[in-house]
Amino acid sequence: MDKYYICKLNKNEHKILKKNPHCIQFFCEVDRIKKSKWPFNKYTIRRSKYTNFYWYKKPRKTGLIQESNLPAISFKDLKREKIFKTTDDIKLNKKVTYEPRKQRPSTTTHLGQLKLFLSTVQFLLYYAPKDKEVHVIYPGSAHGYNIMFLTELFPQCKWHLIDPGNFYKKLYKNPKIVDIQNMLFTDKLVEEKKKTLKDKYKLLISDIRLNPTDEDIDRDNRLQEKWVKILKPNYAQLKWRIPRITKIYKYFDGIDYLQMFAADASTETRLVVKGTGKIKMKEWKYEDDENVMYYFNRILRPSYYKTNVKHKCIDHCHDCVAMIKLLTEYKEKYPKNKFSQQSISNMIETLLKRIQNVKVRLCNDFNKTLKNLR
């Protein structure tokens, strides 16, 4: 059995949210939420005393919070001037600390394949020289459905794919894929790659993660750390999360990039590290990181950002507009690529079709959320 809730809205809020359903949760803090006595259908909705609201359900065992520690919200705070690329871009009030979502709804969208694809595009756009042969070493790359598309977007890249899982069969016939190793990235293989790619421009992308426990996260972080120190890539993009095993966690210093279309309460980011020369280290604090990501996920992601680009399954939320900005940057840097020779709206449509199951899931989620807005 589920619990049913409504989030009360005013007319101005309701009007803008009709076109921006990903932004609904911005207004749905504790003081706006009421528990409903009945499930919602076409009959019970007519009996509701509220005229503007969003309804949703939660598992019966969901706990309650009595008071939010987030800043007071208002309609004028919904709109923001610029997107946030990194965690350093977020200036956080020290009074904001992480607390569980509990009865509050989530209206942002989680699409793992789209998240991974856009993070990879961002990394290659910023760190793969356009006029130089680039070798991309990629442990954790199976099944690799999106890599076929990436080889078209970045033709200067040659790919070394490593994963014990099964790879997409078409990758074996792609001339840009120079090596596929159906195995773990062992110390022996790391040394082999170091030797064969000596004096080559190298990028390391790591997407390893089997289990979400803090012990496993620490183990994966240390594996990535070892690979960077041995391979010495020009840059590495590492799957990054601070384990809660100690208050201060010593790890690489780098640029901590936010992800688009991550899980609604995710603290995972992508850490980009310069692998040549003396590698800088940093003392990370998981509590600080959790607080920043909590504020980002609850307030900044569902805020409204300016764009003139339209598509039937996206709106003005942070994830959607950050994707638009990234594609605009790609179009400017690679104007002659076939993908760039269309409007941004059509670029979005193309990539949604090329990434497995993404368009259906994105549009279904968009329309389902919109349907619950009354």
Where in the sequence are the language-model features?
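Conserved class I S-adenosyl-L-methionine
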Residues: 133-142
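S-adenosyl-L-methionine
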Residues: 167-198
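C-terminal lobe and adjacent flexible extensions of AdoMet/dcAdoMet transferase-like proteins
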Residues: 299-374
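Class I SAM-dependent methyltransferase Rossmann-like catalytic core
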Residues: 59, 63-131
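Conserved acidic E/D residue at the C-terminus of a beta-strand in Rossmann-like folds
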Residues: 161-166
